[in-house]
């Protein structure tokens, strides 16, 4: 029976490990590229989200529960990882889809921060256990998904459709289906979530990662072109010396600092 449970949870555990590895790879890629040129933070937040999600997947498998030396710590770690999921998800949606809302994302993020503080306070004061306040985390995950859907609908309403929007539209169907399936299984008493939702989420994340990497490469190329054009505008091609265009910012600074007596 023990071996059967390990084999049964082998695929979900492998999918969780793949998510963690993919998230670490994305974080490493963003940190490396960020030193060379300005790129969007969408890859950063997607890497944090994928790593957190993969670690939660690993802890929610039956094999990790059976192999855990400290079940209490295992349960608390799983709940805390789930608490942290909505924030990087909403920040990724805002940067990836280039949402124009000024306050909605911030309000949801601060609501999630307040929810985390309340849940941890109740746990530390022995008023409510993390398992008893799990419904609050589910509410915040639902709000994050609603923000995702709102951003997509807002883009369609203003006719600003891009390939990123179509990817997120298809991904939202997968995300909502997997979310409702997992929550239904949880409230029905299931101890483990099925591999179908994990596979769908992994494919969605891989698609987002590839598209985000492609966009970052375009941003790097645009930055290099801008630097090259600026160098061509400020230097003479034959002599390599700076021309008068290079000294215009200096002249403006000098003129602004002149004081008449």
Regions found by a protein language model. Give the residues of each.
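Cytosolic nucleotide-binding catalytic cores of signal-transduction proteins
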Residues: 252-256
């Amino acid at each position: 029976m023990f071996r059967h449970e390990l084999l049964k949870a082998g695929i979900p555990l492998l999918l969780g490990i793949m998510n963690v590895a993919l998230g670490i790879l994305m974080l490493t890629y963003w940190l490396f590229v960020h030193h060379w040129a300005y790129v969007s933070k969408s890859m950063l937040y997607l890497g944090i989200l994928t790593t957190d999600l993969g670690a939660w997947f690993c802890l929610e498998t039956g094999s990790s529960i059976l192999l855990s030396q400290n079940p209490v710590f295992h349960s608390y770690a799983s709940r805390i990882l789930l608490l942290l999921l909505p924030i990087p998800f909403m920040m990724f949606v805002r940067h990836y889809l280039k949402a124009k809302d000024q306050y909605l994302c911030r309000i949801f993020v601060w609501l999630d921060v307040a929810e985390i503080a309340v849940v941890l306070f109740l746990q530390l004061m022995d008023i409510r256990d993390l398992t008893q306040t799990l419904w609050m985390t589910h509410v915040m995950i639902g709000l994050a998904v609603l923000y995702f859907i709102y951003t997509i609908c807002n883009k369609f309403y203003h006719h600003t459709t891009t390939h990123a929007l179509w990817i997120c539209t298809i991904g939202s169907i997968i995300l909502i289906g997997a979310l409702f399936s997992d929550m239904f299984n949880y409230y029905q008493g299931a101890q483990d979530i099925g591999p179908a939702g994990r596979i769908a989420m992994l494919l969605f994340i891989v698609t987002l990662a590839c598209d985000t990497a492609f966009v970052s490469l375009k941003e790097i190329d645009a930055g290099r072109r801008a630097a090259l054009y600026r160098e061509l505008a400020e230097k003479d091609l034959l002599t390599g010396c700076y021309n008068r265009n290079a000294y215009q910012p200096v002249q403006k600074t000098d003129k602004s600092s002149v004081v008449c007596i």
